[in-house]
UniProtKB/Swiss-Prot annotation:
Gene Ontology BP term (one): establishment of meiotic sister chromatid cohesion
The name this protein goes by in its record: Long arms of the bivalent protein 1
Entry keyword annotation includes NAD: no
Disruption phenotype: RNAi-mediated knockdown results in embryonic lethality in 57% of animals, and of the surviving progeny, there is a 6% increase in the number of males (Him phenotype). Defective sister chromatid cohesion during meiosis and mitosis. Mis-localized air-2 in oocytes at the diakinesis phase of prophase I in meiosis. Impaired meiotic DNA double-strand break repair as evidenced by increased rad-51 positive nuclei throughout late pachytene to early diplotene in gonads, and impaired number of crossover recombination events between chromatids.
Source organism phylogeny: Eukaryota, Metazoa, Ecdysozoa, Nematoda, Chromadorea
Region listing for Disordered, in residue ranges: 85-161
Subunit composition and interactions: Interacts with gsp-1 and gsp-2; the interaction is direct.
Any one cellular-component term (Gene Ontology): condensed chromosome
């Protein structure tokens, strides 16, 4: 039997616009203030390998393609923003790096020490169940299909019908 699971996360096709750049340290302060209800997905940063900076970008998603509903704001690590080529270079020239001081007090976790920020960030990484880099997180079929396929493959290989 094939069972299906519904993935409610949008699947980005490409970056349309780069809005903001934060250092990874400053993002750790900001990330604690981003709620799941505001539509800004941070799983790409939490599960990615951000080295220096992270970027707030608008992406076009596979869902409702070519409509306003397909545009989502997400945060991505530097390597994904850099992959936009000319758009990234233009952004880098035109936009200074944001700092936490340019973000409202409500969005930043101001009272945290560096160790506390790192601990909170690691906790957020562990609590994030969706991994956008894992192909299994993006499929519409779960392991029941894989087991059925493996069973039928074994039957075919053994010559049984």
């Amino acid at each position: 039997m094939v069972s299906h699971k519904k993935n409610d996360r949008p699947r980005p096709l490409w970056i349309l616009k780069i809005h903001k750049r934060l250092s990874l340290f400053e993002f750790k302060r900001y990330a604690t203030g981003i709620g799941k209800d505001d539509g800004q997905d941070i799983s790409w940063v939490l599960k990615g390998n951000a080295k220096n900076n992270v970027y707030q970008v608008t992406v076009e998603t596979m869902e409702n393609c070519e409509t306003d509903e397909c545009k989502k704001v997400i945060w991505v690590p530097d390597e994904l923003a850099e992959s936009t080529g000319t758009m990234f270079e233009d952004f880098k020239e035109d936009q200074p790096q944001e700092s936490v001081s340019s973000i409202s007090n409500n969005e930043a976790n101001w009272g945290s020490s560096v160790n506390e920020l790192d601990e909170n960030y690691e906790k957020m990484q562990k609590e994030e169940t969706f991994d956008p880099y894992d192909s299994d997180s993006d499929t519409s079929e779960d392991s029941d299909f894989d087991e059925d396929f493996e069973d039928s493959d074994k039957t075919m290989c053994s010559g049984q019908s």
